[in-house]
Amino acid sequence: MASLTGAAAVLLAFILAYSTALTIYRLFFHPLARFPGPRLAAATKWYEFYFDIIKSPGGQFFKELSRMHDVYGPIVRVNPDEIHVRDAAWFEVLYAPNPTKRNKYRPSAEMAGLTLGIHGTVDHDLHRRRRMAIAPMFNKQSILSAEHLIKQHIDELTDVFESYLGTNNPINLQTTFLAYTTDVLYHYMFDTDAGYQRDSGAAQQWRHSMDAVAQATPFLKQFPSLLSRVALIPLPMLIWVLKRIQPDVAGLLGTHQLMASIVSKYMASKPEEDQDELIATKAVKPRTLFHAIEASSLPPHEKAPTRLAQEGLTVLFAGGETGSRLLAHTVYHLLKNPEILEKVRKEILDAAGDSNQLPDMKALEALPWLTASVRESLRLRAATTSRLPLVTEKPLAYADWVIPPNTPVSMSHGDILHNEDIFPDPMKFMPSRWFNASPQQNRLFVPFGKGTRMCVGMNFAYCEIYMSLAVILARFDLELYDTRWERDVHYTRDCFLGEPDPASPGIRVKVVADHKTFTRS
């Protein structure tokens, strides 16, 4: 017993000595020791842990980050290893285009547990090759060729809205639009019918799974390698356990199983003689995301089933939630501004003329009020609230500061898009600001990011959003139902994507009229 007590004392003494030495190093000898910021944040990552995990309702470090800049200036050491900059003029320096090389900060890349997808790729050159492989799925020509596919799912979306007419029940926009965007993604990317819009129970469960991810994200930011460790557990066993302790997360892992099944079917049906088709996909839209990767110049190990599945999951998770929340927020803002809504509706109907047919994407993009409303919603409600750290192998200069090489450096989209010097009255929904936008405003409209890590799905997102908005706004009269800015719309938590109050029931509307515009022909 005495020996155990002695060993514990030695271990405790070692931990205290190590912690003291590490703190002294970080405060006085670390390459970032001279940079401004709270001393406690420089000494330990538990400072950030407190704001993201302990301080209610979680995910609060983004507010503390803003306070740091108010106190210490535009460049701040936010934890022992990382620098954050709040200066719009420097955004295009950090998030620079090719040939500038920027690696992703490894903990940030590992957080989602999908290190084989483009979002989780650390190395700049490997990211560029992986991105080029899937680019044919996201170019404008490919997307415009699939308008008919998107229209099929818009028909199902209108069926959902129509089913609420006369019921006096509200429709949850985030749940409904998530089912739509997810169905479109499965069909367009994987040639698979997910059927969420035809199964309200499955749609609601998928919504709960996304909410569970949001709730877990602040924790995963603090322990970014956790999911990689969990992935070592066989998936069926992991699902069995989670169904009993956290069924919403188990549902998310069911998506991993489904993606593995989709990849298996693709691999089994891939004929050896399909090379002519693969070559042709370089000129037209590939049949699926996996066909695009197969047709690329990536080496064979980059076309392995596990790699394909992780790339598929990356696209699915990145595209579904962001598109659905943009749709919900745009509808919210237009319903709060009925005079703008009427202008948007009128120009959509004028573009259609007497045809009662939805105008194509090119025509919709040319509509000034619709375009300005989408841009303004993107600016106001840009999905990513987290800072986005990159690493460079060379020193970076900011003002009089020289940031050492291999230091993670980050900026935040909100600091640009809500900057009152760039966008006056920044928290007001004002689409008209885009009619006479300055070159600076257009250049710093960065909801999809900038540089080599810019969102690859921008054109796809615009297409599914423009087309569905045009139909919903022209066809249905909606009114908000018990929806409050402070509780249901305003971001109060950083869960990588911004999230409202945990008690929010979501943005909800009632369907009060159906004008039968753009109905099935």
UniProtKB/Swiss-Prot annotation:
The keyword Oxidoreductase applies. The chain crosses the membrane at residues 7-29. SUPFAM superfamilies: Cytochrome P450 (SSF48264). It is found in: Membrane. PROSITE patterns: CYTOCHROME_P450. It comes from Aspergillus oryzae (strain ATCC 42149 / RIB 40) (Yellow koji mold). This is Cytochrome P450 monooxygenase hepH. It is a single-pass membrane protein. Disruption phenotype: Abolishes the production of heptelidic acid. Pathway: Secondary metabolite biosynthesis. Its EC number is 1.-.-.-. Its cofactor is heme. One of its GO terms (cellular component) is membrane. Cytochrome P450 monooxygenase; part of the gene cluster that mediates the biosynthesis of heptelidic acid (HA), a sesquiterpene lactone that acts as an inhibitor of glyceraldehyde-3-phosphatedehydrogenase (GAPDH) and a growth inhibitor of the salt-tolerant lactic acid bacteria in soy sauce brewing. It comes from the Eukaryota. The gene is hepH.
